[in-house]
Swiss-Prot record:
Keyword Metal-binding: no
GO molecular function: aminoacyl-tRNA deacylase activity; ATP binding; leucine-tRNA ligase activity
PANTHER family: LEUCINE--TRNA LIGASE, MITOCHONDRIAL (PTHR43740:SF2), LEUCYL-TRNA SYNTHETASE (PTHR43740)
GO terms, biological process: leucyl-tRNA aminoacylation
Motif ('HIGH' region): 42-52
HAMAP family for this protein: Leu_tRNA_synth_B
Location, primary (coarse class): cytoplasm
Source species: Buchnera aphidicola subsp. Baizongia pistaciae (strain Bp)
Gene: leuS
This protein's name: Leucine--tRNA ligase
């Protein structure tokens, strides 16, 4: 063992052993408790960023810890490899997206290996390979057979920049989630999977996920959005036409309805538009709008049709408006609006000066004064004719009863969740395994043709969607010519089932091996960002239920425990150019100025520019505040990064990147290395720990050792407070640095303490721990197969030795160390032979002995 810590030599050495021995390969073992640890796999964009490093370090720490607990751990890695970035890069660089993707995978895989991550690389998955997506195509056909898939022309979110459809979950503030460009509405044919069939189950089963973050469950609950209400038939004024299925969410407020809103695609909207040019123009303009009825803060606009419907009870005329915020394909594409008691409706009514009528009293019985805020309390009904003075629930019941008795209304439950649009109009994705016959009928492609493989010989100078690629167009089905579907799958479909394929990635007889999948599933620990709460994390719960209903998996949910790690932040800086436009600038390009408290100044001058400090914000390429993991590894080593990431903040919180903190961690590792080196050089393994010979200091350290093992175990297992666990290990390690190694029992205590410290640090800093363990362990074992240390209850719950105060005639004269609960005779045997006590006794007879065990012995002479 070398005297100084040198990660540049240690880490490659340890990694080479792991590779040679295939240390982390795992197979099914019914004699061991299984543990499946999985982090969301990356898109092979080119390089890992610090967010990746944090995510995968967390999962690796958990996986290594669970192995030390004796569990059979599956910890796989793969690549979510289809998608627009590869296609756009291919266009830009005149290359094939496959080539770009596989080159990135090769580079990023080496980066992951350099981080010391304990993956079973034999289970690696790449989702753009036919051997993966062929089973996705098979799966889609099975869903089609079960009537869970359909194609229809519908309004979709369209990204003009990327020329493709976006799911509702992929539109954020009317912008594309990926490219941040404006999203418009467009009507095209799309394939859908009926996720709405599972809406109730997806919602209810959130209650069966006690180890998921409440925030994620709340986000999913709101996204699925279960609502109750009634649908009503209304007569149009001066016409015999019936307006069907007009929705109101709170029946008790029906008497306060003052107008009706329709979606632009409502049948009546089109009928009116045929006669009125301005309305036709308005409907066309709405196609570029992505507002929804749930977007309270968005700009909602409407147009008066000058048509009226009759209130179902009062028969008063209600004006009909067409608006941009009623969803086109929603169950509620016509709404009976009650502005006094609904904020959406109130905002619209105020904007267009529509009537506002309150019909529910405040809880104190007073009439509400409606200005800018709707009244939503559940008081008594008033201003409601025959329903006056009924309480809220009774009023709702009576109104529903009257509507149903008159056959003009019925109770319904609907969901905000929409069916999943899985068609994408791009090349780099899995082809949808459907075709169109000459009679326009959609048919699944026969299984013998699967997989439908992307044409790879096309020139990529002018890459186009599959609809423009003649190599994929024609196929014969039952001797009939069929035109292949030109759309590809939404890449969220690939990422919705890799967790299951990891359990059996070399299984060739089907999508999933039931035997292997049901040994490993559900995933015990899943790690990923909370930004996936209403996209990936809903989709893969849904797909798991589909797999269950196909008989491929047994559990109802794919994951037991979810951890959403926080973002990684770093300092960002900007200046204003001559056009007064904000320009972000890298910290490497400026000289940062600090104030008297060593904090970065809010603004300062560098290179003749006034530089502003934006504070700690999320690392990103656009802000030039990213930190390259490779640079930090070269400077400090992988283990330093790993330990800093796990120590600097709770895993679910944002982590502020500070190189001063990295330096502090590196300094700690160097000190611990030197301490271990000095001990190993002196220690003779024949020296045994003899607790009965401990001094008070040794006893204290021994007790602290076992307290540390206990509390670190609790922090990791119970609350995943890894940062607190590390701080406890560091605190105890610093205690060890004060021990003199000249005393044999000190050496024995140091040996036992260092063994435990290195074991506890192993999940965090595996290279460092591996290298020291080779020399520290008496049997020269491999730490990769060592168990987590166990603590001694006796050492924690009670002291092994106590200080006994010796008094003579009530005055303190001496103190000794004695084992707990030592007898009076034993204490006397010790002290009566000591010269100090003999001097005070001066040969006088002892008249009385007062002994309080573990505290005081008083001799009365």
């Amino acid at each position: 063992m070398k005297q100084n810590y040198c990660p540049k030599t240690i880490e490659p050495y340890v990694q080479s052993i792991w590779k040679k021995k295939n240390t982390f390969k795992v197979t099914e073992n019914s004699n061991k408790e299984k543990f499946y640890c999985l982090a969301m796999i990356p898109y092979p964009s080119g390089k890992l960023h610090m967010g990746h490093v944090r995510n995968y370090t967390i999962s690796d720490v958990i996986a290594r810890y669970q192995r030390m607990l004796g569990k059979n751990v599956l910890h796989p890695m793969g690549w979510d490899a289809f998608g627009l970035p590869a296609e756009n890069a291919a266009i830009k660089n005149n290359t094939h997206p496959a080539q770009w993707t596989y080159e990135n995978i090769k580079y990023m895989k080496q980066q992951l290996i350099s981080l010391g991550l304990s993956y079973d690389w034999d289970r690696e998955i790449t989702t753009c390979k036919p051997e993966y997506y062929q089973w996705e195509q098979w799966f889609f056909i099975e869903l089609y057979k079960k009537n869970l898939v359909y194609k229809k022309k519908s309004w979709v979110n369209w990204c003009e920049y990327d020329k493709t459809v976006l799911a509702n979950e992929q539109v954020i503030n009317e912008l594309c989630w990926r490219c941040n460009n404006k999203v418009i509405k467009k009507k095209i044919f799309q394939w859908f999977i009926k996720i709405t069939k599972y809406a109730e189950e997806l919602l209810n089963d959130l209650d069966n996920l006690p180890e998921w973050p409440e925030k994620v469950k709340t986000m999913q609950h709101n996204w699925i959005g279960r609502n109750h209400g009634i649908k009503i038939k209304l007569k149009l004024a001066n016409q015999h036409t019936i307006l069907n299925d007009v929705f109101i969410s709170k029946p008790s407020t029906l008497m306060g309805a003052t107008f009706i809103t329709l979606s632009p695609s409502h049948e009546l909207s089109f009928k009116i538009a045929r006669k009125k040019h301005k309305i036709q123009e308005f409907i066309e303009n709405c196609s570029s709008n992505t507002n929804t009825y749930n977007d309270i803060n968005n700009t909602n606009i409407g147009i008066n049709t000058n048509e009226f419907a009759l209130h179902p009870i009062t028969k008063k005329k209600l004006p009909i408006w067409i608006t941009n915020y009623v969803l086109s394909d929603y169950d509620t594409n016509s709404i009976l609006c009650v502005p006094a008691h609904n904020q959406h409706d109130l905002n619209f009514a105020i904007k267009y000066n529509l009537k506002i009528k309150a019909v529910i009293l405040n809880l104190d019985g007073t009439e509400p004064k409606i200005k800018n805020t709707a009244m939503t309390s559940m008081g008594k009904l008033f201003n409601s004719n025959q329903y006056n003075n009924l309480n809220y629930q009774e009023g709702s019941y009576r109104i529903i009863q009257d509507l149903e008795n008159n056959h003009i209304g019925k109770k319904i439950t609907y969901y905000r969740l929409r069916d999943w649009s899985i068609s994408r109009q791009r090349y780099w994705g899995a082809p949808i395994p459907m075709a169109v016959l000459e009679n326009k009928k959609n048919v699944p492609i026969p299984k013998q043709y699967l997989p439908i493989i992307l044409p790879e010989t096309i020139p990529f100078k002018n890459i186009k969607p599959l609809s423009n690629n003649i190599l994929l167009k024609k196929i014969y089905i039952d001797e009939k010519i069929a035109i292949c579907e030109s759309d590809t799958f939404d890449t969220f479909l690939e990422s919705s089932w890799y967790y299951a394929r990891f359990t059996c990635n070399n299984f060739h007889k089907g999508m999933i091996s039931q035997k292997l999948a049901n040994y490993w599933l559900p995933v015990d620990q899943y790690i990923g960002g909370i930004e996936h709460a209403v996209m990936h994390l809903i989709y893969f719960r849904f797909v798991h239920k589909l797999l269950r209903d196909l008989g491929l998996v047994y559990s109802n949910e794919p994951v037991k425990k979810l951890l959403c790690q926080g973002m990684v932040l770093s300092d960002a800086f900007y200046y204003f150019d001559h056009n007064k436009q904000k320009q972000w600038i890298s910290a490497k390009s400026i000289t940062i100025k600090y104030d008297s408290n060593h904090k970065i100044q809010s603004h300062f001058y560098s290179n003749n520019k006034k530089i502003f400090h934006a504070g700690m914000i999320k690392m990103s390429k656009s802000k030039f505040n990213g930190i390259e993991p490779e640079d930090i590894i070269k400077k400090y080593g992988t283990d330093t990064i790993r330990l800093f990431i796990m120590f600097a903040a709770p895993v679910e919180s944002a982590l502020e990147w500070k190189e001063s903190g990295v330096k502090g961690i590196h300094k700690f590792l160097k000190k611990l290395w030197v301490l271990s080196y000095n001990h190993i050089k002196l220690y003779n393994h024949k020296i045994k720990l003899r607790i009965n010979l401990f001094t008070e200091q040794q006893q204290h350290i021994y007790s602290e050792l076992h307290k540390t093992i206990k509390i670190v175990s609790q922090y990791i297992t119970d609350t995943q407070s890894f940062n607190v666990a590390i701080s406890k290990i560091m605190k105890f390690s610093n205690t060890l640095m004060s021990i003199s190694l000249k005393n044999e029992q000190n050496q024995a205590l140091m040996q036992e303490s260092l063994l435990a410290v290195i074991q506890m640090l192993y999940p965090f800093i595996p290279h460092f721990s591996f290298a020291i363990w080779e020399f520290l362990s008496p049997k020269k074992e491999n730490i990769d197969f060592i168990s987590w240390p166990k603590y001694n209850f006796k050492a924690i719950l009670s002291k092994l030795k106590y200080t006994i105060i010796i008094q003579i005639n009530g005055k303190k004269r001496h103190k000794i160390l004695a084992l707990k609960n030592s007898s009076q005779e034993k204490i006397l045997e010790i002290i009566l032979n000591e010269n100090k006590i003999k001097k005070y006794l001066n040969n006088k007879p002892i008249q009385k002995i007062i002994y309080i065990p573990n505290k005081i012995l008083n001799l009365v002479i």
